[in-house]
Amino acid sequence: MEIILQDTVANLGKLGDKVVVKSGYARNFLFPQQKAVPANKANLEAFETRRVELEAKQAANLAAAEKRGAALAALEAVVIASKAGDVGKLFGSIGTRDIATAITAAGVPVVKSEVRLPEGALRNTGLFEIAVVVHSEVSTIVKIEVVQAE
């Protein structure tokens, strides 16, 4: 199915690109989230009239994401206290929800879907560098310090 992207989609294309995707991906994901429209003559003309508006909206979203990214980069190490054994192994683990809550409490709002833990949940005490992706083009590293709770 040929579509016109109305927003930048990771690994697919940028605003205004005409791409071919599987019809299920278009119907079930891209169309409901208004990230794309079917590529027909009427939609192509409608898109061209709205192009400036969509580009301005995308630029505003990117500027807001860069501002949040700068605020996240300016954070000192965020401390999370958790129960742990004598050798520093946690009783349980610290996942994306716990990290997002701690960063939000530190003053910068973050949702758990923006936190990336490629190696899985944190299971030990120590200092960790966590990637936070606030926009498809903006990502930053936040230092998380896991300490033993008293």
From Swiss-Prot:
The keyword Coiled coil does not apply. GO terms for molecular function: rRNA binding; structural constituent of ribosome. One of its GO terms (biological process) is translation. It comes from the Bacteria. GO terms for cellular component: ribonucleoprotein complex; ribosome. Keywords: Ribonucleoprotein, Ribosomal protein, RNA-binding, rRNA-binding. InterPro entries: Ribosomal_bL9, Ribosomal_bL9/RNase_H1_N, Ribosomal_bL9_bac/chp, Ribosomal_bL9_C, Ribosomal_bL9_C_sf, Ribosomal_bL9_N, Ribosomal_bL9_N_sf. Belongs to the bacterial ribosomal protein bL9 family. HAMAP family: Ribosomal_bL9. Binds to the 23S rRNA. This is Large ribosomal subunit protein bL9. The gene is rplI.
